[in-house]
Amino acid sequence: LDKPVLIEGPPGVGKTELAKSVANMLALNCIRLQCYEGLDESKAIYEWKYGKQLLYTQVLKETLGEILEGAKGLTESVAKLHEFGDVFFSEDFLEPRPLLKALKEEAGCVLLIDEIDKSDHEFESLLLEMLSDYQLSIPEIGTIKANPDRKPLVFLTSNNTREISDALKRRCLHLYIPFPDADLESQIVKARVPEVPEELRRQLVTFIQALRELDLKKVPAISETIDWAKTLILLHTESLDSELVKQTLNVILKFQEDIEAVTGEVQMLTNKATKAP
């Protein structure tokens, strides 16, 4: 459909990894723009190489006599200098940022605009031309367009911390990724940490799934499940027990208030995980 993909879902479900995996699968360069409050065109699109412009201006100043030699009157002098003014605002003096880099990739690329919900609404407006026409307009130069045969594959991710504008959503296909169910999460752990015994894998996934049902400040993401699996392997764990779980809660819970809230439930959750079929 030749459209960007907006991927939404809770933090840690693999939205960013999806874009990276597409780049790896297609053997394309992945250009990433990490969004944040206050992000503007100088960090996302382009800025001028002011140091280089200043250096060339100094060189021009030192050779001014040679340049203006033979000029008759002010009009001819201005005309000669005008040619150099245009040079200073050419692509040679342009420092491309992620969005412009993606357009200039002749072989195509994957452009990952990560956590768009952390940026301002004003930045969303800057993206609209890029998302709809795969081009960017620079006042001093003109419009720079992507190779029509190898346009960048654009992925935007959002953790839904704020509402994305309708204008941006209209330009994108939408994909929502929820937390995986137990079967899928078990497959993910098996793929990422294959040395985990099957029974331990079932227990830790069951425990994590139960944790996500609790009222926590931040529930464990898939990355925390994988980190916990690696930790349990390092501790030579064969089966979960409540004391071991308490000692390793800091691997899967990132806030002390969550650790304190869960500590009293560990025995019950561990029993549920170890006795589940």
Regions found by a protein language model. Name each.
Residues 1-277:
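C-terminal regulatory/interaction module of P-loop NTP-utilizing enzymes
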